[in-house]
Amino acid sequence: MSVLTAAEIMTLIPNRYPILFMDRVDELNPGESITCTKNVTINEEFFQGHFPGNPVMPGVLIIESLAQAASILILKSEQFQGETAYLGAIKQAKFRKVVRPGDVLSLYVEMVKQRSNMGTVKCTASVGEKVACSADLTFIVAAADDKI
């Protein structure tokens, strides 16, 4: 059973098809951690060109999936409700496993540091028991209508 459905996710973050990379939130501990699921299907638009005959999810889109999960974690904190989280930096990104159509990508994000309008999270994307990607992300939070 999910904590948040895709429809509920879309009330929190501005991403939409074809750039919404999350199907559900499975576990949420506001201000601490979040676990989400992305079902990777052959119908994803990026598979048309990455790579024909050998479809692989681009690493940058795995990072984007983690950033979207981080956004939900951040925006579910009382102090940031109604605002938007923006990716500010990517550090220590490592790619260890190829993600292919049919894989279920499990996204885990843990809050490391948070102060005023910015913070850092530690992220892991896994397929089964194997880590596909890990990274530390820094975010900035601003009003949804701010031009930053």
Swiss-Prot record:
Its EC number is 4.2.1.59. One of its GO terms (cellular component) is cytoplasm. One of its GO terms (biological process) is fatty acid biosynthetic process. It is found in: Cytoplasm. InterPro entries: FabA_FabZ, FabZ, HotDog_dom_sf. It catalyses: a (3R)-hydroxyacyl-[ACP] = a (2E)-enoyl-[ACP] + H2O. It holds the Pfam family FabA. Its main location: cytoplasm. The active site is at residue 50. GO terms for molecular function: (3R)-hydroxyacyl-[acyl-carrier-protein] dehydratase activity. Keywords: Cytoplasm, Lipid A biosynthesis, Lipid biosynthesis, Lipid metabolism, Lyase. HAMAP family: FabZ. Involved in unsaturated fatty acids biosynthesis. Catalyzes the dehydration of short chain beta-hydroxyacyl-ACPs and long chain saturated and unsaturated beta-hydroxyacyl-ACPs. Belongs to the thioester dehydratase family. FabZ subfamily. This is 3-hydroxyacyl-[acyl-carrier-protein] dehydratase FabZ. It comes from Levilactobacillus brevis (strain ATCC 367 / BCRC 12310 / CIP 105137 / JCM 1170 / LMG 11437 / NCIMB 947 / NCTC 947) (Lactobacillus brevis).
